[in-house]
């Protein structure tokens, strides 16, 4: 990374008098010596402090913002309008539930609830319900823990019934029926902490899982339905003190090792080998100071000279001042086609070095890719809709396309240029891909998808000739994929932990493939499948990828194995269309972008951009937001019992019974009063404890944060967000343990992850920006205004003194006495009394103390003022010490 690229490219944030961020200014430079371009992102708020509009740098002068919001009087979102994803309007009920919804596709949605505000039906007006839910009542069988649980779901994919639950709510037995009326029953056994101990899939194959004392997965066994004993799939696994996987021994005796930099927790090397044999995989990683991958060295690659070139197997990467990938080099043997479809096997004789250059517009759209290669180079461009971020393949001189023909009003792409047509269902899920249109009266070749609860559960590929119809049907079940063909073949693909898949044919397997073949995948840091091995550690296939997911090299060991590799880039399944299924969306690797807009609006204002245009650092687990692979994913991936831990915390979080709390008390309770009540302090303490641990762990991965600062910020995020959530639940009389289902847990986890990531990138976490303004009534503004001007060490000493039981006044006087500065009158007697009533206990976390210091929120300043805070100061000190060319960040107030 060149220092000159990052010289004088700060990131600035401008706040208004309420402490709300109204401008974010970034400076872009992509080459040494070039002038930095100023990029301004704008936000607008209503009088209540709620955000109502946002403009990215590309649309900064437009009349229409990228996103606009209309809120109810209570602050709930009523309408969201996006230039990428269209508009959606929600009519909430008295308890905040979504009763009716309208959208830009002309659909009027109706939701029906029972007396406990549980959804019982969802559908479009004038049509049968798309989803219906059935819940067990008080008369249900208590021995199977059914009472209050959802026991049946009917949707377009068929029927799902749940017969038994664990004590902590895990589904122990479920049956799914598709349109063929064949029941598929899956069973799970849970431990006392709700971890899965055993799973029997719909094919009768049984997985057993064993854990160490810390609850981390240690061993995995598999017993096929036709076998009488189990075989080891994962023989052993070890973890370091931070919970990171450091060693795993597979059932094929391949030992994989992960080494991490002790200074920051980043992956330093990845190695896999059978004892006494040459390494099968050995990568070494080089990073810049902020965590961008600069170089990947392949130590197992044998350098070759070909066509007057040295091909050494290493890969190098360059970035602009916004940390977007601008250059990548490596080697390939399969120039990426500019069309849909699966990759074809490579010709090893065509191996060459390549260099790719990437250009972006001010909205973050990748508009040009130049692929430099001795033979087979190319340049590809995208034309972006002037009024949105919708884009299409285009070359200079081509007429401008009609974007309305290629995208619907919700931003779903209807046709891939020079490729298939895409059809979307009412829920904006890809329903059908037309692979080939027949003009001779035959039905079109197509692939059709069905979903349940937001996840794909079935796909069917059909192709037609004049004499016959061929099909491939895939059913997705817990731990199992059932793949059937028109020739009678039925393949059970058993998915196991440790990146292992077992191929079990009910009848005779294809030639050159053993039945019950175990396929072990050796992945890179992004989870991409690079090397497939069988149970004897023999190589089945090798594959490498370009940075944005296209296949650069694919060498299968036999033609028979070609059709049975489905999981590829980033550990995702590639369909016959060439699209990757991520869960919430589909990704087109040849376009380097999603084919539908991000309906969650979680990953920035560009709803089509892929992993912040930094695909070597970020991964997207489900198609909603890019996360740093080396920090957040490792952090949350090692938590084996998230669901049970969240349930236990939520139960304690709820605290005492609230049945006797009057409605008038709930109605008049303010957030500040609640925060300093017993319930509020309990909620903050519990949430801050969890947040401090997460923040500290995040700090170990991001040196700009540091463990202590990470813990403080994590405590502040966790405590404040948790207390606010508990306050809202208190106002409505809802218990967290009942309300936090899987989707909510995912959203809360992502909020914490986003907060940690914001800090790592030198920004105030969004959750703090959104919530701190509600804590503005403090009795000690004078003290805090002065404390925030101190250096970070004095601030930490001040926090420690309060943590030890000293009052705010005493701690302030002690620091000032140490500096031999005359003390002013600090507070009136009433203010002092107010401080003492909320004085923290000795056992409270430092994150809670920081909240005490900042409970007045982001201090009011004249609009447009910019100040550098303590966290940024510490980050700058770190950068000076490491000489990191990181852009400086300025904030309005101090943590």
Predicted segments, located by residue:
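Membrane-active amphipathic alpha-helices enriched in small hydrophobic residues
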Residues: 632-650, 654, 667-737, 744, ...
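Thioester-forming pentapeptide GCGEQ
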Residues: 1-41, 46-47, 170, 176, ...
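Amphipathic, membrane-inserting segments
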Residues: 736-857, 861-864
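Carboxylate/His-rich catalytic cores and anion/metal-binding grooves
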Residues: 40-55, 164-165, 471-493, 531-553
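Acidic/glycine-rich beta-solenoid
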Residues: 31, 60-71, 84-85, 105, ...
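A motif-centric feature for acidic-aromatic and gly/ser/thr-rich catalytic loops and repeats
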Residues: 510-583
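Short turn/helix-capping motifs enriched in Asx and small/polar residues
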Residues: 354, 537-554, 578-579, 584-585, ...
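Intrinsically disordered, low-complexity, serine/threonine- and charge-rich segments
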Residues: 840, 853, 859, 865, ...
């Amino acid at each position: 990374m060149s220092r000159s690229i990052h010289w004088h490219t700060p990131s600035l944030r401008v706040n208004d008098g309420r402490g709300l961020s109204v401008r974010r200014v970034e400076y872009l430079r992509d080459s040494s010596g070039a002038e930095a371009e100023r990029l301004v992102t704008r936000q607008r708020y209503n009088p209540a402090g709620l955000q109502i509009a946002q403009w990215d740098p590309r649309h900064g002068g437009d009349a229409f913002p990228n996103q606009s919001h209309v809120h109810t009087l209570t602050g709930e979102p009523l309408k969201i309008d996006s230039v990428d994803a269209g508009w959606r309007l929600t009519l909430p009920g008295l308890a905040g539930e979504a009763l009716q919804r309208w959208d830009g596709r002309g659909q009027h949605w109706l939701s029906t609830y029972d007396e406990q505000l549980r959804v019982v039906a969802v559908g479009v007006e004038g049509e049968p319900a798309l989803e219906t839910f059935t819940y067990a009542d008080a008369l249900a069988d208590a021995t199977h823990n059914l009472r209050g649980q959802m026991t049946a779901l009917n949707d377009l994919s068929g029927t799902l019934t749940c017969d038994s639950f664990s004590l902590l709510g895990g589904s122990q037995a479920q049956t799914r029926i598709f349109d063929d009326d064949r029941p598929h029953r899956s069973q799970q056994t849970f431990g006392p902490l709700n971890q899965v101990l055993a799973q029997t899939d719909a094919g009768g194959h049984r997985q057993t899982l064993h854990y160490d004392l810390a609850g981390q997965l240690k061993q995995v066994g598999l017993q096929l339905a036709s076998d009488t004993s189990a075989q080891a799939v994962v023989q052993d696994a070890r973890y370091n003190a931070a919970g990171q996987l450091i060693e795993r021994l597979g059932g094929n005796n391949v030992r994989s090792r992960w080494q991490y930099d002790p200074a920051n927790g980043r992956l330093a090397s990845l190695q896999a080998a059978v004892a006494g044999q040459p390494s099968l995989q050995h990568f070494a990683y080089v990073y810049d100071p902020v965590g961008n991958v600069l170089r990947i060295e392949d130590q197992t690659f044998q350098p070759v000279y070909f066509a007057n070139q040295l091909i050494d197997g290493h890969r190098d990467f360059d970035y602009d001042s916004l940390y977007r990938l601008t250059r990548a080099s490596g080697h390939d043997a399969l120039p990426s086609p500019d069309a849909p479809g699966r990759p074809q096997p490579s010709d090893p004789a065509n191996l060459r070095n390549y260099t790719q250059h990437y250009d972006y517009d001010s909205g973050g759209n990748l508009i040009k890719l130049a692929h430099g290669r001795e033979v087979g180079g190319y340049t590809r461009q995208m034309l972006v809709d002037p009024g949105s971020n919708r884009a299409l393949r285009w070359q200079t001189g081509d007429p401008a396309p009609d974007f309305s023909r290629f995208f619907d009003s919700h931003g779903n792409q209807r046709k891939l240029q020079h490729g298939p047509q895409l059809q979307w269902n009412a829920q904006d899920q890809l329903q059908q891909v037309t692979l080939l249109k027949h003009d001779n009266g035959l039905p079109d070749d197509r692939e059709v998808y069905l979903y349940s609860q937001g996840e794909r559960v079935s796909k069917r590929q059909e192709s037609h000739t004049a004499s016959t119809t061929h099909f491939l049907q895939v059913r997705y079940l817990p731990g199992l994929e059932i793949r059937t063909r028109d020739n009678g073949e039925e393949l059970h693909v058993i998915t196991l932990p440790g990146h292992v898949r077992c191929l079990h044919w009910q009848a005779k397997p294809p030639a050159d493939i053993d039945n019950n073949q175990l396929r072990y995948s050796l992945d890179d840091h992004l989870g991409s499948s690079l090397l497939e091995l069988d149970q004897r550690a023999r190589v089945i296939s090798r594959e490498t990828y370009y940075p944005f997911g296209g296949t650069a090299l694919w060498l299968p060991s036999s033609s028979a194995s070609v059709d049975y590799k489905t999981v590829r880039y980033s550990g995702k399944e590639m369909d016959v269309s060439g699209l990757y299924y991520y869960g919430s969306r589909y990704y087109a690797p040849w376009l380097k972008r999603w084919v539908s807009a991000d309906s969650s609006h979680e990953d920035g204002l560009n709803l089509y951009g892929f992993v912040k245009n930094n695909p070597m650092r970020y991964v997207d687990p489900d198609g909603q937001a890019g996360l740093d692979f080396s920090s957040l994913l490792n952090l949350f991936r090692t938590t084996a019992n998230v669901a049970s831990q969240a349930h236990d915390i939520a139960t304690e979080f709820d605290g005492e019974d609230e049945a006797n709390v009057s409605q008038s008390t709930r109605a008049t309770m303010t957030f500040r009063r609640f925060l300093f009540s017993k319930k509020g302090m309990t909620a903050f303490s519990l949430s801050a404890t969890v947040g401090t641990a997460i923040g500290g762990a995040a700090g170990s991965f991001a040196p700009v944060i540091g463990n202590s600062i990470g813990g403080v910020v994590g405590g502040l995020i966790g405590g404040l967000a948790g207390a606010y959530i508990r306050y809202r639940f208190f106002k409505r009389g809802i218990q967290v343990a009942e309300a936090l289902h899987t989707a909510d847990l995912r959203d809360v986890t992502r909020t914490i992850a986003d907060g940690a990531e914001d800090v790592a990138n030198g920004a105030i976490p969004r959750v703090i920006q959104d919530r701190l303004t509600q804590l503005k009534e403090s009795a000690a503004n004078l003290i805090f205004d002065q404390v925030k001007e101190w250096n970070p060490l004095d601030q930490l000493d001040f926090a420690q003194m309060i943590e030890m039981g000293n009052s705010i006044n005493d701690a302030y006087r002690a620091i000032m006495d140490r500096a031999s500065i005359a003390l002013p009158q600090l507070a009136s007697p009433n203010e002092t009394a107010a401080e003492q009533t909320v004085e923290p206990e000795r056992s409270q976390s430092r994150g809670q103390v920081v909240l005490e210091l900042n409970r007045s929120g982001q201090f009011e300043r004249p609009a447009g003022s910019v100040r550098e805070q303590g966290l940024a100061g510490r980050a700058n000190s770190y950068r000076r010490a490491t000489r990191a060319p990181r852009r400086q960040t300025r904030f309005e107030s101090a943590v």
